[in-house]
Amino acid sequence: MEEIDYHWKCQLMGHEVWVEPLSIIYHKGAVTLPVSSPKKTYLNYRNSFILLLTNYRASISLRLFFPRFFMECISLVKEILTFKWGHAFSIVRSWVWIMGHLGVLKKRR
């Protein structure tokens, strides 16, 4: 997510972000954590919320917060209905982390 955050911030500062469609990037995704890992779920949910809260002005973040939270609630219900308790707990844990670190995130804006 670091590269997403970097490019997002560059674009918000007025720089152009380009893509080279013919390029090939070899990326070892999920090497340290498998896709099925609840820890990976936790990190993905937490980090994507961090990007939302730190890369937009407060007014835009607030406007996007509720639709985003609603979608995450749907994901939580799906995990519960499919008995993926570790993933369900990871989603809730990411929310708790965000709520506990709002002051830190505000300073990162």
Model-found features: residue ranges?
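Active-site-adjacent helix/loop segment of glycosyltransferases
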Residues: 16-106
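Short, intrinsically disordered, charge-balanced linker/junction segments flanking boundaries
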Residues: 1, 107-109
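A short, conserved alpha-helix in the catalytic core of glycosyltransferases
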Residues: 1-24
